[in-house]
Amino acid sequence: MAFTLYALIQTAILFTNAIAVLHEERFLSKIGWGAEQGVGGFGDDPGIKAQLLNLIRSVRTVMRVPLIAVNSVCIVLLLLFG
């Protein structure tokens, strides 16, 4: 497989899909990354764990509908052009 722009875009889509399907109660809480784990005090700098949890929640919230459209376009392109 050649290293193309389409391959990079497809990699980003797959990575975003992987983040979007992570379920907080079924998966993240089992490894200690549940909702109550990343709470910090006011004025405290959030740690890397809290920032990653916020990123995961944001991706799941904001990218749910656009991912459906992007995945559909990607599937159609793969069907048409192989």
From Swiss-Prot:
User: Which compartments is it annotated to reside in?
Assistant: Endoplasmic reticulum membrane
| Pfam families, per the entry | Yos1 (PF08571)
Which family is this protein grouped under?
Belongs to the YOS1 family.
Keywords assigned by UniProt?
A: Endoplasmic reticulum, Membrane, Protein transport, Transmembrane, Transmembrane helix, Transport
Which Gene Ontology biological process is one annotated for this entry? Answer: endoplasmic reticulum to Golgi vesicle-mediated transport
What is this protein for, i.e. what is its function?
Answer: Regulator of endoplasmic reticulum secretion that acts as a key determinant of brain size. Required for secretion of extracellular matrix proteins. Required for correct brain development by depositing sufficient extracellular matrix proteins for tissue integrity and the proliferation of neural progenitors. Acts as a regulator of the unfolded protein response (UPR).
Q: How does it sit in the membrane?
A: Multi-pass membrane protein
Name by which UniProt lists this protein: Immediate early response 3-interacting protein 1
Q: Where are the transmembrane segments?
A: 2-22, 62-82
Q: In the UniProt record, what gene is named as encoding this protein?
A: ier3ip1
Provide a GO CC annotation, any one. Answer: Golgi membrane
Source domain of life: Eukaryota
The record's principal subcellular location, in a coarse class, is: endoplasmic reticulum
